[in-house]
Regions:
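C-terminal accessory/connector segments of nucleic-acid motor ATPases
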Residues: 1-9
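Acidic, glycine-rich low-complexity segments with interspersed aromatic residues
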Residues: 11-122
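Compact mixed alphabeta submodule
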Residues: 115-163
Length: 163
């Protein structure tokens, strides 16, 4: 079985959604990137949750139930909101909370906006992250600790997205 170490992605590098999903094996089950509607993908082949975050959301691109407040708390800590139906007692919520104990991984990718002057904006892999704490349900507000500090420009963009 492949592991996270076998995934051909580099921390702090930029990738399209299609490249990310192919690299983590999400598309190997006959799924196509266009069928992924939400910003989370559970990849059982590598025991990894992939979180795709857009920092600056607009009413034209996102519904009221997907206007999640995702932002950096510090260069090492990231505040992320789960899907609007996820509770801390659900299997998905429990997977987030107990990922280290259960031997699963979380990969956090961010981009500033959905599009840029060239089309779809790429995501930057902030890297593996560990659960710190959470508050609430539907959505869960989770704090993740990055294994490596995020680049300064991403930290500043993330802070600006909530200002």
């Amino acid at each position: 079985m492949p592991s996270l170490a076998d995934v051909p992605l580099a921390v702090h590098a930029s990738y399209s959604r299609e490249e990310i999903l192919a690299a983590v094996g999400w598309t190997s089950k006959g799924r196509t990137p266009s069928t992924m509607r939400e910003g989370v993908a559970w990849c059982p082949d590598i025991n990894t949750d992939v979180l795709l975050v857009t920092l600056k959301k607009t009413d034209t691109d996102y519904s009221p139930t997907t206007m999640y407040r995702d932002f950096a708390l510090s260069p090492e800590l990231f505040h992320w909101e789960s899907q609007s139906t996820t509770t801390s007692s659900s299997p998905t919520g429990q997977r987030y909370i107990n990922h280290r104990r259960n031997g699963t991984n979380v990969l956090l990718f961010v981009r500033e906006a959905k599009t840029n002057s060239l089309g779809a904006s790429p995501y930057v892999l902030l890297g593996p992250a560990d659960y710190v704490t959470h508050e609430g349900d539907r959505p869960m507000a989770v704090t993740w600790r990055l294994h490596r500090s995020m680049p300064t420009e991403i930290y500043l963009a993330s802070r600006a997205a909530v200002a």
